[in-house]
Amino acid sequence: MATILIVVLLLASIGVGYGLRAKKHSETLAQARKAAEKIIEHERQKTKAEVAEYEKNSVQETQQYQETIDQELADDLHDNQRKEAWIEQRMNLLNQKKIVLTNRADALAKKRQSLLQERDNVRTTLGEAKQLITDRWNKLQEVADLEEQAASKLVLKETKQDAIRSKDEFVNNAQTELESSCEREAEDLIALAMEHSDVPRGQAENHRSFIAENAEYLGKLIGNSGQNVRAIEALTGVDIVIDDQEKEVILNGYDPVRRAVAMETMEMIKTEKRVVPDTIERLVNKANKVIDQRIRQYGEDAVRELKLKYVAPDLIKFIGRMHYRTSYGQNILEHSIETAKLAGIFAVELGEDATLARRAGLLHDIGKSIDRDIEATHVELGVELTTKYRESPVIVNTIASHHGDVEARYVIANLVEAADAISGARQGARSESVADYIQRIKSLEEIANKHPEVKESYAIQAGRELRVIVQPKETDDKTIHSLATNVKNQIEEDVTYPGQVKVTVVRKLEIVEYVEKKQA
């Protein structure tokens, strides 16, 4: 009985526990549903807020994008208007040039018509002269009863004189008009070339002096007992003078490339913590490489700017070296580029090869890039260099003739000579003052005039040549050689001059006798 009771109680307990568990499960499930509904509602509200925020941001971004597009369209419209104005301006300029060319063509046509009319007039005059001969012939035979041969000689003589006078008058008038026309054409051509010339007017680089930043830098530069400065001087061949009070460092040396290497070395010293002679040697080697790279880059840029065809790599290096050369303060490379552009414009106007003219203009002063310790003029060095690299005979003749030493055999040689003169003579191209120029000219002439056998002397070609006229009776052909040598040596000692000075001694003896008419 007890066992049955226990079983019944156990079953009742199990039933009660199952019921309680089911009730708890139901409550838990209900709570989970409520929590899920809250989460879903929260996410729904969050999503709704995010959608609203996104829509708001989208409107703002769309508005900003629209404003950006409107601004870009306005800028493009402004640029297009500016370009249209520029195009219209260029079209007006081209129309003006077209009008000028048309007027020039009309003037040439009128000139041709005038010459044809003049030719007809000459023919008419000749016909009248022939008729005059016939009339005079008949009149002389009738009036003077001269013989046929005598009358013929007289008539021919008078007619010949009249024809010569008419011819001379016609030739003089034509020559005067031709010279005037040529001058106008030359002025127009030069004005057109200068209008299109856009070479920068930069100053030549200063590789002669600079101010030290501080005493620490001067200490590294000078080194222990000046050993660093001496190392730089020995490796670069440049003399260095240091003013301790002004903190100025001055570089003295004829070769501007070496001065550039020395300057680059001193610039590199600034970043070195410890500087000794071994450091100087390493920096000088590095500076040499840097300057070599710059030289080649200058040459390649010049060739590329002028749109030239193949140029020998070694010749490009000589072109780049011209950047470090100056003449009266004018950078030789910039001067050569400007000369090349002017010569190219001249060539186009005259129907010549513009590319060849630009090449000749770039290379006309190439001899100035060679070391100055070589005993030769820059013209001779340039001829030798371009011949070595097989440049055109036109270019070789251009270099040889651009200072008038030899005759210019090609039109391009004359064009480069004119462009060279324009580039060097324009205002601001060269920095030598008028006072210095006049003093140098006077010094050259005074050196020659000190010699008793000298009659007079002239410094010509801006001081590039000294022409000495001697007394012919006080000298002979042998003594003038020693005179030229003495004048040359004195100029080298007493005068500071750029480039070369040519000394020319002239001895000329004229003997004139007069034959007087005998009295009858």
Swiss-Prot record:
Quote the InterPro entries the UniProt record gives: HD/PDEase_dom, HD_domain, HDIG_dom, KH_dom-like_a/b, KH_dom_type_1, KH_dom_type_1_sf, Ribonuclease_Y, RNase_Y_N
Which EC number(s) does the record attach to this protein?
3.1.-.-
The subcellular location is:
Cell membrane
Give GO MF terms, alphabetically: RNA binding; RNA endonuclease activity
Q: Name one Pfam family in it.
A: HD
Q: Which NCBIfam families match?
A: HDIG, RNase_Y
What is the protein name given in its UniProt record? Ribonuclease Y 2
